[in-house]
Each structure stands twice: as structure tokens, then as C-alpha cells.
């Protein structure tokens, strides 16, 4: 089973009292599988990993692995600010049954490129899971440069990168490193279609929490080089790309999920979607139903 196509960075549903809503979690997982996603990320930034206890982390990963039952790839977010803690969290995810570790660059500490190289090598050597690098400078404060990635691609336990930067030059530099054992995944919904048309292997998406089938359709078209159809779907989904960044992730996408009956909000310091954006959430949640139906029909006809 390849690591490619549409991979959803799952939001974590909470109940009205703020505890994990495992019934909603299982329903979200089934909706994702029914929509055709090819992988899931558990307890990443979209999953509010920083707000989860160790026991909650274990519960989410274990439940996802059991629910998925080998049907798609399970990636667990394991990146923390220190190398030793990241290794320990990666080992924890391995014990829980995850197939891959999604390892973000260490937040806040801003290591040098040499430090990033040593960090990822240590995690790959000692974590017990295949590592997918994750670069998202807007959140972490450091940028994993292509030349550093180039020094990591030969490591047998480093199998890909999720790149949230969208510049064509960055994407091209990473796509040039692709191989049978190293994949390039977009981490930006808004530019993902163009990245895949340029050779990227897939998308780790936020908005696919609410529209799994539509984003599967987008990825299928872009990955097979169907420019006109891919661009048409990218246009249909452009409002969702934008909306999911209108406030800090995962605030907007959790507003969409709540309207679909999944979850009841966020944990501090994140607050619910502001009143000014609620009408847009209402409209987009309603429109998502039609887009999911259209994408399903197209995939059945393809």
C-alpha cells in the first residue's frame, strides 16, 4: 500500500464537556474511508496534538488503527520540540500500531540546518517507524531547506516529506528527489493541485475532513495529469481551501465538522469560529453535501 493520494490530517472530536468523543471519532474515520481517502494522520496539528494528554493520544491512535483495520495507512504525529521526546513519542506510536510517523520540524527552538539534519537522523535511527518529514515554517519558526532534505533522502527509514510551503521552486526541488522509496506530499490545500500536476505524490489535507470524496477526486485527477478536470475541481474547492485558513487551523474545519454532526468545539487556547465567519461556515457546510455527491458520481463513472 503506497503512501500517496489523499491523506486527511484528522481533527480530533471533543464532546460538549471537552472530553474525547470516541463515537464521533469512529464516525469520522468511517466517513473518511467511505469517501475514499488513502491515509489518515492522527494527532497532528489539525488534531490539536498539543492539547492531548498521553492517555488521549494513545486512545486516538489505538482506536484509529483498530477502526481502519489495514484499509489505509495510519500516520501518527510524533514531532516535539526535543529530539529525545520525539524519539520516545515515535516509539509510542509504533507500539500503538501506526505505520508511519509524521515528524514536524521542532517547534519554537529554531535549530540550524545542521541541527535539523541531526535531529531527523536520530529519530529515523531510533524511533522504530518510517519517518515522513514535515515542514511548516509558519507554525514552527524554522524552514527545512531542500538541501537538508537532499541529505536525508538516502536514509532507509526516511520515506517522504509533507511540505506546506507552496512556492513552485520549492515544490520542483523536492519533486526532483522523488523515488520509489521517497514521496513528496503537499501540505497546502490551496496549491496541492498544481503541486501534484508538477509531480508531487499526494496531499495531506485539512479540508478533506469535511469533503473526503471531493479531495480524493481532486487528487486522482491531478496525479494522473488531467489538467483541465483537476483545475475545475480545484476551482470548485477553492472556497474550502481559503476558508480553512481564515482562522487558525483547525478552528474553521471543526466548524464544518460540527455542522455535519462531528464534535463540539476545540480546547483552549483555541476558541470556536468567530461570529463574522459563521455564515460562511453555514453555506460551505451545506454546499459540501452536493460536492461530495458529485465527486462520488464522477468516481463511479471513471
From Swiss-Prot:
Gene3D superfamilies: Aldolase class I. PROSITE patterns: DHDPS_1 (PS00665), DHDPS_2 (PS00666). The record marks 45, 108 as: Part of a proton relay during catalysis. One of its GO terms (cellular component) is cytosol. GO terms for biological process: diaminopimelate biosynthetic process; lysine biosynthetic process via diaminopimelate. InterPro entries: Aldolase_TIM, DapA, DapA-like, Schiff_base-form_aldolases_AS, Schiff_base-form_aldolases_CS. The keyword Lyase applies. Pfam families: DHDPS (PF00701). Its EC number is 4.3.3.7. It catalyses: L-aspartate 4-semialdehyde + pyruvate = (2S,4S)-4-hydroxy-2,3,4,5-tetrahydrodipicolinate + H2O + H(+). The active site is at 134 (proton donor/acceptor), 162 (schiff-base intermediate with substrate). Belongs to the DapA family. Homotetramer; dimer of dimers. This is 4-hydroxy-tetrahydrodipicolinate synthase. It comes from Xanthomonas campestris pv. campestris (strain ATCC 33913 / DSM 3586 / NCPPB 528 / LMG 568 / P 25). The gene is dapA.
Amino acid at each position: 500500500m503506497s503512501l500517496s493520494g489523499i491523506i486527511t490530517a484528522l481533527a480530533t472530536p471533543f464532546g460538549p464537556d471537552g472530553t474525547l468523543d470516541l463515537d464521533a471519532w469512529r464516525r469520522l474515520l468511517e466517513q473518511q474511508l467511505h469517501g475514499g481517502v488513502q491515509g489518515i494522520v492522527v494527532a497532528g496539528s489539525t488534531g490539536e496534538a498539543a492539547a492531548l494528554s498521553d492517555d488521549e493520544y494513545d486512545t486516538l491512535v489505538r482506536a484509529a488503527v483498530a477502526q481502519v483495520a489495514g484499509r489505509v495507512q495510519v500516520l501518527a504525529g510524533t514531532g516535539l520540540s526535543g529530539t529525545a521526546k520525539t524519539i520516545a513519542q515515535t516509539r509510542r506510536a509504533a507500539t500503538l500500531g501506526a505505520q508511519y510517523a509524521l515528524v514536524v520540524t521542532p517547534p519554537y527552538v529554531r535549530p540550524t540546518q545542521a541541527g535539523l539534519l541531526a535531529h531527523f537522523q536520530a529519530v529515523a535511527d531510533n524511533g522504530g517507524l518510517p519517518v515522513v518529514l514535515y515542514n511548516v515554517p509558519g507554525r514552527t519558526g524554522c524552514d527545512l531547506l531542500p538541501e537538508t532534505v537532499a541529505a536525508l533522502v538516502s536514509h532507509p527509514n526516511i520515506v517522504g516529506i509533507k511540505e506546506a510551503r507552496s512556492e513552485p521552486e520549492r515544490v520542483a526541488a523536492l519533486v526532483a528527489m522523488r523515488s520509489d522509496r521517497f514521496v513528496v506530499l503537499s501540505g497546502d490545500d490551496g496549491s496541492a493541485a498544481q503541486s501534484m500536476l508538477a509531480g508531487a505524490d499526494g496531499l495531506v489535507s485539512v479540508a478533506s475532513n469535511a469533503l473526503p470524496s471531493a479531495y480524493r477526486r481532486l487528487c486522482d485527477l491531478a496525479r494522473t495529469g488531467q489538467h483541465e478536470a483537476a483545475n475545475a475541481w480545484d476551482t470548485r474547492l477553492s472556497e474550502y481551501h481559503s476558508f480553512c485558513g481564515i482562522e487558525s487551523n483547525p478552528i474553521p474545519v471543526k466548524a464544518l465538522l460540527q455542522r455535519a454532526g462531528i464534535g463540539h468545539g476545540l480546547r483552549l487556547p483555541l476558541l470556536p469560529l468567530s461570529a463574522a465567519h459563521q455564515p460562511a461556515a453555514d453555506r460551505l457546510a451545506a454546499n459540501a453535501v452536493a460536492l461530495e455527491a458529485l465527486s462520488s458520481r464522477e468516481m463511479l463513472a471513471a
